[in-house]
């Protein structure tokens, strides 16, 4: 099962936490979910060049707190905080509640799965050979402390007629072990030959579960 399932969803409540952290009654659930999707799409579009790894949305009583994990916090904040204030006002219009935006820096973007996937897709769109992009990402991740990494690319690689899938792995990536901290990210490269999908798994070591850490 660990081979097929999303590694993040597989470890929810054991090692990982949800990216949307709120609870509501049945009537409002679909509205809140649509708001979350709209906010994420807006932020990902506006911060496309800010190397955003993840977006956490929390909803305390009648307001919202959004945490943006990025390797380039200066790009998100902008000169004298102007850009982040514009973001906050626009997100408030989408959510219809007061919003607080918090920025957290990703210290090692080379071992963040989502940023690795985004970096590879950017290189593919610039017509860089997919093997070179994948191998370079693997070397950087292993050099900066990853215990294992696996990268998979699918589509018309190098413009070939028949789509295929290629993957590279270095180190170990235990997909069945629940206590294994496996970071997972996906991205799509829009090339002249069509879309190329990229998936990245990064194994950062084994950890105690959420409940064990609390005890």
Swiss-Prot record:
KH type-2 domain boundaries? 39-107
Q: What is an example of a GO molecular function annotated in this UniProt entry?
A: mRNA binding
Give the residues annotated as coiled coil.
Answer: none
The residues forming the signal peptide are: none
Q: Which UniProt keywords apply?
A: Ribonucleoprotein, Ribosomal protein, RNA-binding, rRNA-binding
Q: Which domain of life is it from?
A: Bacteria
What InterPro entries does UniProt report for this protein, alphabetically?
KH_dom (IPR004087), KH_dom-like_a/b (IPR015946), KH_dom_type_2 (IPR004044), KH_sf_prok-type (IPR009019), Ribosomal_S3_C_sf (IPR036419), Ribosomal_uS3_bac-typ (IPR005704), Ribosomal_uS3_C (IPR001351), Ribosomal_uS3_CS (IPR018280)
Q: Name one Pfam family in it.
A: Ribosomal_S3_C
Q: Does the keyword Ribonucleoprotein apply?
A: yes
Biological process (GO) annotations held by this record are: translation
Q: What GO terms fall under cellular component here? A: cytosolic small ribosomal subunit
The yes or no answer to whether the keyword Ribosomal protein is present is yes
What is the annotated quaternary arrangement, including any partners? Part of the 30S ribosomal subunit. Forms a tight complex with proteins S10 and S14.
Free-text function comment from the UniProt entry: Binds the lower part of the 30S subunit head. Binds mRNA in the 70S ribosome, positioning it for translation.
Record family assignment: Belongs to the universal ribosomal protein uS3 family.
Q: Which NCBIfam families match?
A: rpsC_bact
- The name this protein carries in UniProt is Small ribosomal subunit protein uS3
Q: Which organism is it from?
A: Nitrosomonas europaea (strain ATCC 19718 / CIP 103999 / KCTC 2705 / NBRC 14298)
